Regions:
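Chitinase-like catalytic core of GlcNAc-active glycosidases
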Residues: 2-240, 248-251, 260-289
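Conserved, well-structured core segments
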Residues: 257
Length: 290
């Protein structure tokens, strides 16, 4: 088994795909699965893409989902499950900010109650991934993350820009509570296509000090084959080449965006060789270990 962290983000199929999707992930070689995206509406409800899954302190999602997600981490390659909040064009973090300003983050607040209900219903969730692409408010981020940590969640950040915001938020959180934030899942595609993990590693190192393992904290991600005709994005072999180029930076893993597109394009024939889930997990490992 590799000690590298290999993650895959995915959306609807994780909720609607049933046991076949769970089995595909378990047999893939990916060590982390990130369910994307949880949205927080103005009343604090938690919505997984379209269906509401938590409301008024109660889990109201598909009753079979907690069992499927528990099974995900049993007997396969997956050892960590994250739920990601946000994305492009959502008001999730603005809603979180407004809810914190009106109710705080204590046990009586709806944010606390709903994230506690999520953890109680699906205890196999290890952490919450923050994909803030609009608000970038450090006070909101710090208060929200401290609440999540108190409920038993790890926290990861999923940045594509605004480096100083993310690095300063990391410092504010981890200088008070070492280990609260466990990594940056750095988008190196779409809006983040110009990102070089080394720049982020250097910025984290400078802020956090010489004893902090900045190289082991940044996990770059690439977008698999996608788009009309599956002609956009990366094939597994180009992902291997990119991770090989990043290997000297000392990174210890990476991620693939997006499982939905792996499913869509797996049989498109637009890459030489396999385009299945396992091929993409292997591509990261081959790049970093080859």
């Amino acid at each position: 088994m590799s000690s590298l962290m290999t993650a895959v983000y995915g959306g609807g199929p994780f909720y609607t795909g049933g046991q076949p999707v769970i089995d595909d992930l378990k047999n893939s070689g990916f060590t982390t699965v990130v369910a994307w995206a949880v949205h927080v509406n103005s009343s604090g409800d938690l919505i997984y893409n379209d269906p509401t899954i938590v409301s008024n302190g109660q889990y109201v999602g598909d009753s079979s989902w907690p069992g499927l997600l528990a099974n995900l981490k049993q007997g396969g390659s997956v050892n960590r499950l994250l739920f990601s909040i946000g994305g492009w064009g959502t008001g999730d973090f603005e809603n979180i900010q407004a809810l914190i300003q009106s109710q705080g983050t204590g046990p009586d607040s709806i944010l606390y109650k709903n994230f506690q209900a999520l953890k109680n219903a699906i205890p196999s969730i290890d952490g919450i991934d923050l994909d803030d692409e609009s608000l970038y408010d450090q006070d909101t981020t710090v208060q929200f993350c401290q609440m999540l940590y108190g409920l038993g969640y790890q926290v990861t950040f999923c940045p594509y820009t605004m480096m100083s915001f993310w690095v300063n938020s990391l410092y504010a959180l981890n200088s008070q509570t070492p280990g609260l934030v466990t990594g940056f899942n750095l988008q190196c595609y779409a809006g983040g296509a110009g990102n070089d993990p080394k720049d982020w590693i250097d910025a984290i190192q400078k802020k956090m000090g010489p004893d902090f393992d900045a190289a082991g904290f940044v996990f770059p991600g690439l977008w698999c084959r996608n788009g009309d005709g599956c002609t956009q994005g990366d094939c597994p072999d180009s992902i291997t080449s990119q991770f090989k180029a990043w290997k000297p930076d000392g990174i210890q893993g990476g991620f693939i965006w997006l499982y939905d597109d792996i499913q869509k394009c797996e049989n498109s024939g637009t890459c030489s060789g396999s385009m299945g889930t396992a091929a993409y997990a292997s591509a990261i490992v081959q790049g970093l270990q080859g």
